[in-house]
Every structure is written in C-alpha cells, then in structure tokens.
C-alpha cells in the first residue's frame, strides 16, 4: 500500500529508513507555511540519532510529539509527591490501580530506568544506553522488575487509559 503520511515512533523510523521505506519530505509547500523550521534543534538532534545508511532522519521524518512516556495520575488518590518517581508504580498502596502502556519500549524502558536510577543520577549510564541494552542481564532485570510490578497492574492499555482512569478503575497510567 502507498501512504502519504505515517506516524511511526522513533525506533520504527530507524527501521523504515534501514529498509528504504521512507521518501524524503517534499518541502515545496507552496502557500502552506513550512513548520519544519520551528522544530527544536535539540529534538532534531534526537531524531537524527536514528539516521542510518547515509540518510539523515529529519529529512524523512518530522518529530511531532516528544516525551510521551510519563506518569498520568489521579490527584484524588495519588499525591503529587508520589507521582514524581517511577518507583510509584511499584508502591503496593496502588495494588491493582496501575495501567501499564502496552508498549514494549515504554515498559522495558521504565523497568530499566527504575533499576538503574542511582547509576543514571550519578551519570554512569544514559537513558539511550539503557533503552538499547538487550543483553541477557538487561532482559533478566526487566523480567524481574515487571514481575514485581504485576500485583499493581490493573491492565495493559494503548488508547483507553484516560477513560479507565476517569471511571476510577485505575489511579496511575
């Protein structure tokens, strides 16, 4: 199938570039404003980290959203101070009240970031290094952390989290 526009995540952009599935963005917008110049240089640098085979990612993809992995919480049930750390997800007082993203990278990253929080704070490791660590040790850590998290999980979701939270079935997402 041919598509004019797709909305893949950054790691899928990398795969699509590698498999030659993307065309360069046609910047001849005519009278339509060119918003590409308004993208933060920092974000362009981050998307360009996925460049490969001589293709610069920002010539093929426009970052339209940034920082989608965070903690959504119901302030009636979760104090703001609790929601400031990934550790809240493992807190037993939220047993059965957590919705986890049905996203491999979000779950994997959350588990590794929590496990390595002290090393991250000390500058011994970076988030990109953790996110790209698929060693047996990293996988074992993620498995252990997700198993520890299991009692708190109400369900796994991709799109219905806000609705479930407004019904009071979950307090964290």
Per-segment meaning from a language model:
Residues 1, 13, 86, 161-164:
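Short, hydrophobic alpha-helical packing/hinge segments within bilobed ligand-binding/sensory domains
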Residues 1-19:
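Early extracytoplasmic/lumenal segment of secretory-pathway proteins
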Residues 8, 57, 66-68, 95:
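Extracytoplasmic
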Residues 10-12, 21, 30, 75-77, ...:
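Solvent-exposed coil/turn segments that connect beta secondary-structure elements
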Residues 14-66, 80-87:
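Hinge/lid segment of periplasmic solute-binding proteins
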Residues 68-80:
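Hydrophobic/proline-rich hinge and linker segments of small-molecule sensing/allosteric domains
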Residues 77-84, 116-122:
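Short helix-loop capping/hinge motifs at secondary-structure junctions, enriched
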Residues 97-100, 107, 111-173:
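Ligand-binding pocket segment of bilobal, Venus flytrap-like solute-binding proteins
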């Amino acid at each position: 199938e041919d598509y004019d526009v797709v909305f893949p995540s950054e790691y899928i952009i990398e795969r699509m570039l590698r498999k030659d599935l993307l065309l360069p963005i046609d910047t001849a917008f005519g009278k339509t404003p060119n918003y590409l110049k308004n993208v933060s240089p920092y974000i362009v640098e981050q998307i360009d980290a996925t460049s490969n085979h001589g293709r610069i990612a920002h010539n093929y993809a426009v970052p339209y959203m940034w920082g989608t992995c965070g903690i959504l919480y119901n302030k009636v049930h979760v104090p703001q101070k609790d929601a400031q750390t990934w550790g809240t997800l493992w807190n037993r007082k939220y047993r059965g009240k957590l919705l986890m993203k049905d996203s491999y990278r979000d779950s994997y990253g959350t588990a590794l970031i929590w496990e390595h929080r002290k090393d991250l704070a000390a500058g011994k490791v970076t988030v990109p290094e953790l996110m790209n660590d698929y060693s047996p040790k990293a996988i074992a850590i993620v498995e252990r952390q997700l198993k520890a998290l299991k009692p708190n999980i109400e369900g796994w979701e991709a799109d219905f989290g806000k609705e479930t939270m407004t019904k009071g079935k979950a307090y964290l997402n």
